[in-house]
Structures are given as C-alpha cells and as structure tokens.
C-alpha cells in the first residue's frame, strides 16, 4: 500500500528446544553439496521454516523435530530391540500422518495388522466389567434418563414390552432382558422354520464345500465352527470314514442338503431367542474364546470371526435330520444363557485357546434329550449378538428371505 514500506522478515533462528509451531526441512536439500547421512544423524541436520500458530489455524502442531529425532534413533536399533516396541509403534503408525514412521522400514519393521491389533484388545475383561455394571441397581430417579437415552440411541420400541414403565427395571440387565407382550410376536404356524430372534439376515443358503458364509464373500470352516464329531454327542450320525467330509457326517438321510442362516442381533433388538422349530436338543458344546464385535462391518473385516468368538452350540435332530442352533457371543455380551442348562457358565476369566466343553442332555432317565416346541423360550443375551442355524433338510427346502432384510422373532425363515 502507498505510504507504507515493506520490510523483509528476518530468517528464524533454530533454538535448543524444539518449538511446536515450527516444522523442519532437510538442510541438505538447499544445495550444499554434502552427502546425506544415515541413521539418527540425518535427522539432526534440519532447518526451520515458519508454520502458522494455533491461534491462526485452530490446529495443534506437535514438536515434530523431537519426534523425528526419536524415530531416527529407533531406525538404528536392532530387530529384537525394535520388536519389543512393535505394539506402541503400530498405534502411532495408524494415528500419525502417512509416512511419519517411514524411517523404521530401513530395519525391516512392519506395522502389526489392524486385525491383530484389534484382537489384542482385552474384550473378555471389558465384557466382564460391563456385565458387573449391568447388575448395579440404578436409583429410582436415574432410571428414566438412562433408559430413555438407550431407547433414543438404538431405536427401541417400548410399546412392545410387557412392562412399559421404565422405573420397573432396576438395572440395565433387567432392561436388556425385558419380555414382550404375547401379541407382539405371533409365531407363524404355516412354515416349518421360523426366526428364533429379532435381527438382520446376514446370510443364508446351502452349505457348500464344508464352508459357511458369515457375510457375502467371507467364509469360515464348518468343522471349526461346530467342532469335531464325537461319540458323546448322541446324534444319529452316519459312520465316519477316513475320506468322508465333515458335511457328509452331518447329513443323516440320503438326498438331503445342509442349510445355514445367520441372524445378527443389534443392541436395540429384542435380546431373547426362541426355538426355531420343533426339535430335540441332545448335546451342548461350549467354546470359550474372544468376544469381538460381530456387527456386519466387523464380520467383513475378520475372517472366521464366528470361530474366534465364544459360542454355545446346541445340536439335536428334527423331523428331517440334523439341526443345530449356535449363540455367538460378542463384545459386552459375555453372558449367554440357556434356560434349561444350569451348568453353562460363559466368559470365564481363564480358558485354553481352542478348547471346548461337551455336555449331553441324554441320560438314563431321559434318553430323548430336551424337546423344544417352535417358539418356546430357549435363551438370552445381555446385549446384541448373532444366532447361526445349521440344519439338514430335503432339496426342495426354500428360504423366504433376502440378505440384509430385517426380521422379527416368529416370522418365517423357510419351508418345504
């Protein structure tokens, strides 16, 4: 502007302590002709250029010089020493801007995958803590605000509840396990298999190549999910041969096929599950395991997620042969309850990875097992989770479903 002289700003001088509002550049790039040094020495030859302060940009800039000096020191470490710092470095890798940890690639460091990082989270411990929190009795004046927030967040329809008064539920656990009005979920009597719970259909169809789809394009092994066949299951299995597949060991009648259906229960859904058909439960197998989230996004991300998580497999038979219902645990769903199984205890503090516990309902006094009628109460979760049905049926069995559709307990899954 006229009348005003412009004076060049003096070049900033480096100081001893790194300043969070200045960023470094390599001094060697200004044409001094010197060769680039290696290791931590290359991070000490930095010039300073100005960067807008926090007041101008509204963003906080970290002391990058000190950070990069530290990364230079790490890049000179041996692989064993660097391996001890792998987990905290991986966390920084996913939080810092792209390329910030690039110097560590000189010694062969690679970040831990997101899946492995997520599996390292103590989900079982968090779920046990959540379970204890659910049992804490809320003051009478606090119940309506807490439950109303949950209802608004997850879209719960309290008009279907047998007791609509929010002050009736003493703690979160009672609220999650609320009963429905009898007319809220009529059971379809025209179809042979109904939905055991409210939820979302993730996948369904025939079991092919001994694999089951948890979501579209992501499969898991049928044998890993149900566990190996054992004589203690008291099921009418055909005799196994060395070359027989696991699927053929489950199909008891010639000409039948094996089918599956996966139902995801969201946190706002009705948390109890019921018998999907008339059948007899003869065996229970409990797999202790992780308690990772089972929402559809996570199911697409982690292969064989249902095989990693804790689950309770109920097996038996119905009029067409083999039938099984599996309740899969998830984060904050450490408690899976089966009403007629008092010996079942889930989310124990200690367990052996890959182990399972068998229990037979066939005894000398009861040689048939536990008979279940279609629609009868079977069990419950503390929060949302997943139900997996695997059953044998004739080839003309047809599902009346679409992938991704919402379904409610009592509605038809399929029929002959």
From Swiss-Prot:
The chain crosses the membrane at residues 68-86. The modification Pyruvic acid (Ser) is found at residue 385. Is synthesized initially as an inactive proenzyme. Formation of the active enzyme involves a self-maturation process in which the active site pyruvoyl group is generated from an internal serine residue via an autocatalytic post-translational modification. Two non-identical subunits are generated from the proenzyme in this reaction, and the pyruvate is formed at the N-terminus of the alpha chain, which is derived from the carboxyl end of the proenzyme. The keyword S-adenosyl-L-methionine does not apply. Residues 1-67 are mitochondrial matrix. The keyword Transmembrane applies. GO terms for cellular component: lipid droplet; mitochondrial inner membrane; mitochondrion. Coiled coil: none annotated. Binds 1 pyruvoyl group covalently per subunit. Pathway: Phospholipid metabolism; phosphatidylethanolamine biosynthesis. It catalyses: a 1,2-diacyl-sn-glycero-3-phospho-L-serine + H(+) = a 1,2-diacyl-sn-glycero-3-phosphoethanolamine + CO2. GO terms for biological process: lipid droplet formation; mitochondrial protein catabolic process; phosphatidylethanolamine biosynthetic process; protein autoprocessing; regulation of mitochondrion organization. Residues 87-416 are mitochondrial intermembrane. Its cofactor is pyruvate. It is an enzyme of class 4 (lyase). Belongs to the phosphatidylserine decarboxylase family. PSD-B subfamily. Eukaryotic type I sub-subfamily. HAMAP family: PS_decarb_PSD_B_type1_euk. Catalyzes the formation of phosphatidylethanolamine (PtdEtn) from phosphatidylserine (PtdSer). Plays a central role in phospholipid metabolism and in the interorganelle trafficking of phosphatidylserine. May be involved in lipid droplet biogenesis at the endoplasmic reticulum membrane. This protein may be expected to contain an N-terminal transit peptide but none has been predicted. Heterodimer of a large membrane-associated beta subunit and a small pyruvoyl-containing alpha subunit. This is Phosphatidylserine decarboxylase proenzyme, mitochondrial. It comes from Bos taurus.
């Amino acid at each position: 502007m006229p009348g005003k002289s412009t004076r060049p700003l003096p070049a900033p001088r480096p100081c001893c302590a790194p300043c969070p509002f200045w960023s470094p550049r390599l001094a060697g790039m200004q044409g001094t002709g010197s060769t680039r040094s290696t290791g931590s020495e290359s991070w000490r030859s930095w010039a300073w250029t100005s960067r807008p302060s926090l007041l101008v940009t509204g963003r906080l800039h970290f002391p990058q010089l000190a950070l990069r000096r530290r990364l230079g020191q790490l890049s000179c470490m041996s692989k064993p020493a660097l391996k001890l710092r792998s987990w905290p470095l991986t966390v920084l890798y996913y939080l810092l801007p792209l390329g910030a940890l690039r110097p560590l690639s000189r010694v062969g460091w690679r970040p831990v995958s997101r899946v492995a990082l997520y599996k390292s989270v103590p989900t079982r411990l968090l779920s046990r803590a959540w379970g204890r929190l659910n049992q804490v009795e809320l003051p009478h004046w606090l119940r309506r605000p807490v439950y109303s927030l949950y209802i608004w967040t997850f879209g719960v329809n309290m008009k279907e509840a047998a007791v609509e008064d929010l002050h009736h539920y003493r703690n979160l656990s009672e609220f999650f396990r609320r009963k429905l009005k009898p007319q809220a979920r009529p059971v379809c009597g025209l179809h042979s298999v109904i939905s055991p719970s409210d939820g979302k259909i993730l996948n369904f169809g025939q079991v092919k190549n001994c694999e089951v789809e948890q979501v579209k394009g992501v499969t898991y092994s049928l044998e890993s999910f149900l566990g190996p066949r054992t004589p203690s299951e008291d099921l009418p299995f055909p005799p196994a041969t060395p070359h027989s597949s696991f699927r053929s060991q489950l199909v008891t009648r010639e000409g039948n096929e094996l089918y599956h259906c996966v139902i995801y229960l969201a946190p706002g859904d009705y948390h109890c599950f019921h018998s999907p058909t008339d059948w007899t439960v003869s065996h229970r197998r409990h797999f202790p395991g992780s308690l990772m989230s089972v929402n559809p996004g996570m199911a697409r991300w982690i292969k064989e997620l249902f095989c990693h998580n804790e689950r309770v497999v109920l097996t038996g038979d119905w009029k067409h042969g083999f039938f099984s219902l599996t309740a899969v645990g998830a984060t904050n769903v450490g408690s899976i309850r089966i009403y007629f199984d008092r010996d079942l205890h889930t989310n124990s503090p200690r367990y052996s990875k890959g182990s399972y516990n068998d229990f037979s309902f066939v005894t000398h006094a009861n040689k048939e097992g536990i008979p279940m009628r279609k629609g009868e109460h079977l069990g419950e979760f503390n929060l949302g989770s997943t139900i997996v049905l695997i059953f044998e049926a004739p080839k003309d069995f047809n599902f009346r479903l679409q992938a991704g559709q919402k379904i409610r307990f009592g509605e038809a899954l399929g029929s002959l």
